[in-house]
């Protein structure tokens, strides 16, 4: 029995080694794919690791230590919050809604979202506030589980409540 136990443990060690080896080859393949992407976008690769720079012209901010959001969109925190940056020969601003750079003409004054996205946001806000008595997305329900709706003139909704003398008893929630 002792021989079987040691034989079984050896088998497990070999199997775990194989799993580790598979994981190493998977990560190597992912790194090669990442390098190919960088090579296509920047023209050359950095052998010490993937090249992570802000996409703004002449910005040398190292994105390795940046937050995931900034790495994902390839923009450093300074340029994401800047009122204007020089990118591709144009003055642009980073839109928080689109997560892209747009021309300055697409923004209202010092806003951080472009007009197109703000218009959609405002439309959704107006649409939902007119439909519900309790405000935008509150999720409050009326009688019989139906959402209490207001009419076009925003009149009051009539509700009939049980008489105080009746035998109606409220259930106590514990």
From Swiss-Prot:
<protein>
    <recommendedName>
        <fullName>Squamosa promoter-binding-like protein 4</fullName>
    </recommendedName>
</protein>
<feature type="binding site">
    <location>
        <position position="98"/>
    </location>
    <ligand>
        <name>Zn(2+) 2</name>
    </ligand>
</feature>
<feature type="region of interest" description="Disordered">
    <location>
        <begin position="118"/>
        <end position="148"/>
    </location>
</feature>
<feature type="binding site">
    <location>
        <position position="79"/>
    </location>
    <ligand>
        <name>Zn(2+) 1</name>
    </ligand>
</feature>
<dbReference type="GO" id="GO:0005634">
    <property type="term" value="C:nucleus"/>
</dbReference>
<feature type="compositionally biased region" description="Polar residues">
    <location>
        <begin position="163"/>
        <end position="174"/>
    </location>
</feature>
<dbReference type="GO" id="GO:0005737">
    <property type="term" value="C:cytoplasm"/>
</dbReference>
<dbReference type="InterPro" id="IPR044817">
    <property type="entry name" value="SBP-like"/>
</dbReference>
<feature type="short sequence motif" description="Bipartite nuclear localization signal">
    <location>
        <begin position="111"/>
        <end position="127"/>
    </location>
</feature>
<feature type="binding site">
    <location>
        <position position="59"/>
    </location>
    <ligand>
        <name>Zn(2+) 1</name>
    </ligand>
</feature>
<keyword id="KW-0539">Nucleus</keyword>
<feature type="compositionally biased region" description="Acidic residues">
    <location>
        <begin position="19"/>
        <end position="33"/>
    </location>
</feature>
<dbReference type="InterPro" id="IPR017238">
    <property type="entry name" value="SBP_fam"/>
</dbReference>
<dbReference type="InterPro" id="IPR036893">
    <property type="entry name" value="SBP_sf"/>
</dbReference>
<dbReference type="InterPro" id="IPR004333">
    <property type="entry name" value="SBP_dom"/>
</dbReference>
<dbReference type="GO" id="GO:0009908">
    <property type="term" value="P:flower development"/>
</dbReference>
<comment type="function">
    <text>Trans-acting factor that binds specifically to the consensus nucleotide sequence 5'-TNCGTACAA-3' of AP1 promoter. Promotes both vegetative phase change and flowering.</text>
</comment>
<dbReference type="GO" id="GO:0000976">
    <property type="term" value="F:transcription cis-regulatory region binding"/>
</dbReference>
<dbReference type="Pfam" id="PF03110">
    <property type="entry name" value="SBP"/>
</dbReference>
<keyword id="KW-0804">Transcription</keyword>
<feature type="binding site">
    <location>
        <position position="76"/>
    </location>
    <ligand>
        <name>Zn(2+) 1</name>
    </ligand>
</feature>
<keyword id="KW-0238">DNA-binding</keyword>
<keyword id="KW-0805">Transcription regulation</keyword>
<dbReference type="GO" id="GO:0003700">
    <property type="term" value="F:DNA-binding transcription factor activity"/>
</dbReference>
<dbReference type="GO" id="GO:0008270">
    <property type="term" value="F:zinc ion binding"/>
</dbReference>
<keyword id="KW-0862">Zinc</keyword>
<keyword id="KW-0963">Cytoplasm</keyword>
<feature type="binding site">
    <location>
        <position position="95"/>
    </location>
    <ligand>
        <name>Zn(2+) 2</name>
    </ligand>
</feature>
<keyword id="KW-0863">Zinc-finger</keyword>
<feature type="compositionally biased region" description="Basic residues">
    <location>
        <begin position="118"/>
        <end position="127"/>
    </location>
</feature>
<feature type="region of interest" description="Disordered">
    <location>
        <begin position="1"/>
        <end position="42"/>
    </location>
</feature>
<feature type="binding site">
    <location>
        <position position="54"/>
    </location>
    <ligand>
        <name>Zn(2+) 1</name>
    </ligand>
</feature>
<keyword id="KW-0479">Metal-binding</keyword>
<feature type="binding site">
    <location>
        <position position="114"/>
    </location>
    <ligand>
        <name>Zn(2+) 2</name>
    </ligand>
</feature>
<dbReference type="GO" id="GO:0010321">
    <property type="term" value="P:regulation of vegetative phase change"/>
</dbReference>
<feature type="region of interest" description="Disordered">
    <location>
        <begin position="155"/>
        <end position="174"/>
    </location>
</feature>
<dbReference type="GO" id="GO:0006355">
    <property type="term" value="P:regulation of DNA-templated transcription"/>
</dbReference>
<feature type="binding site">
    <location>
        <position position="102"/>
    </location>
    <ligand>
        <name>Zn(2+) 2</name>
    </ligand>
</feature>
<feature type="zinc finger region" description="SBP-type">
    <location>
        <begin position="51"/>
        <end position="128"/>
    </location>
</feature>
